[in-house]
Amino acid sequence: MKLRNVLIVVKDIEQSKKYYHDLFGLEMLLDNGGNMILSEGLVLQEEECWKDFLQGDVLLRNNHSELYFEEAEIESFVDKLERLYPETEYVNSLTTHSWGQKVIRFYDLDGNLIEVGTPA
């Protein structure tokens, strides 16, 4: 068995595709209408489709998981994030852990938690 993808729920799939391309360089590989596979194994699922599958509500900002990215030039990434998406809601600003790794945590446009850190 092999883990193939990670799926996150989004309200506007086109807006989210642009967001993940702008910030992380992810490209669309397949558009299934309401479900979109991006490079690096990230899948965007429209909220209404997901609600139909689950037959229930989607819990935003649940902090049960996060998408983790690594970026050696993290200060440049933070500048880009602030320039392109100034309304970003931060969980924590750029911080340095005791072991020397720099990280930042924030929510995407739909409340999915993202962490960006320098390589360990």
Regions found by a protein language model. Give the residues of each.
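Short beta-strand-to-loop elements that line the ligand-binding cleft
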Residues: I8, L29, N92-T96
